[in-house]
Amino acid sequence: MELKIAQIQMPVTADREENIRCACDMVRQAGDIDMAVLPEMFCCPYDNACFRPYGEAEGGPAYRALSALARERGIWLVGGTLPELAEDRVYNTCYVFAPDGQLAAKHRKMHLFDIDVAGGQRFMESETLTAGNSVTTFETPWGVVGVCVCFDFRFTELSELMVLAGAKLVVVPAAFNMTTGPAHWELLFRQRAVDGQCYTVGTSPARDTAAGYVAWGHSIVCDPW
């Protein structure tokens, strides 16, 4: 059974409301689709200084906009990620909405992006974010779908657990950068697809070379071959 997926490789600016509008507009422009996938931190600059100020509790404005959009379009919507505020903590959270607008799954990024590459990128998510602790899958008419976030995907065991739970498709909102992207983006998505004998989808923000954090782009779909 055919599954039409739109990857929303959108620009992310400092204007939170405009980012939400842009995401919704691009999903509408995708036309006749079954599923849309937004990128990591789709409504927030990828910057530790921004995560808490741009954050919202579950059920906040961005959550409601995505729920309404899924219902309006009658699609499965993997809502990228946004900073979720909960009990004075901040999580990098992906909400998944069913075609009726109901929450189908929620994944908090488990493996925080803490790297310091000599001559390259330094970023420490753990300075502001708290890690999640769950493996996330959800049922669709096309079968089980797994979801994780960016750095999660580097850890083979997490992908294996999703596949063991029945996932034939693993969807990954991600924001690899100009250091990690050229080295590992395509490699990881092809490797996980072959190892797990599943399809993999990686959705990135658009590249903005003027941003403080420059995303690699190159949203990708890989088959098990």
Predicted regions and their residues:
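Active-site catalytic loop in hydrolytic enzyme cores
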Residues: 85-165, 178-188
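Residue-level recognition of beta-strand->loop/alpha-helix junctions
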Residues: 9-11, 108, 204
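Short beta-strand segments enriched in small/hydrophobic residues
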Residues: 1-11
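Active-site beta-strand/loop signature of hydrolases that rely on acidic residues for catalysis
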Residues: 5, 27-52, 70, 77-78, ...
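CN hydrolase (nitrilase-like) catalytic-core segments centered on the catalytic cysteine
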Residues: 58-78, 153-225
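Short amphipathic alpha-helices and their capping/turn segments at secondary-structure boundaries
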Residues: 20-33, 159
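A short acidic, glycine-rich active-site loop
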Residues: 53-64, 123-129
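Conserved hydrophobic/aromatic positions in well-ordered beta-strands
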Residues: 6, 95-97, 220
